[in-house]
Amino acid sequence: VRGYMDAEAYALSTYQTASKLCSGGTIGAEASCNKIFWSEMDLLIHETAMDLLGARAEIEPQTAAEFAELGSWLDGFMFAQSGPIYAGTNEIQRNIIAERVLGMPRK
């Protein structure tokens, strides 16, 4: 349930950012918020899928039928691990939010 709710919240946040850009605005710290939210949501969704699939999650699909049934959750899970690191670590993104949104001093 949380993964679904997070995905819906992320979609709304993305729509808000796109709307702001379409109306001539610029984006700021909300890009950092979106990045953090997305990378943590991606981890949650893939961890949940791995838990639900159990040992089957570790088996790469060998046929089209297996791929249709299981997808490639293992690949997605492995890729999701890098989300909090690439495109600026989540720690850096949190510092940007602290400085630009909360007005805190630089670290």
Predicted features by range, described:
Residues 1-107:
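Alpha-helical interface subdomain recognition
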